[in-house]
């Protein structure tokens, strides 16, 4: 029985390796050496590519890890990989996803969707959607501390499509892994800010209620090279619903 199971396991691994090698022709990949061995950064892949991969241990939902969460996440990544308005990049090791970053369109009827519409109304030459959101960036617990999140963000934004976009990231402290890192909320916030700044994001002031709920929460944004300065100015104005007044208006 053990020999049969081992043989099946070898055939499964060989099949996965063959499938991945076939999909290499349509996937943008970059090999990266780490202290734990070589990994592959991948993006612009199909749903079938995801199906050939397992989920790394310690990769769940936000800072929680349960098998069912990892399994659910794999299904989500598989489905969104086929969406034209969604961008996904992964860190792959030994045919398993050990990290990923997901960029999505703003939710319908949200404040960010309204800002997207306002930007398109003022600058109709911009492609819809012009505003995107970094929905999630996760790294498997054993693969943290290797600089992979920084490398993955840089790899994602090598895609020139983002030079025509504004990408926001809403950082909410209830999603942070404070327990395992031992960091205070403000220290974790600083760590995240440095991470996003390395990929071209900037800190932005906003009166958004969800972000303002906790002092350590923050909003950052990355402006593509092809976004007009006037559109950047309008974006910043739209981050506050308070009436804009000039000097001397009180």
Which residues fall in each region the model found?
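Short, histidine-centered active-site or binding-site loop motifs used for metal coordination
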Residues: 136-138, 172-173
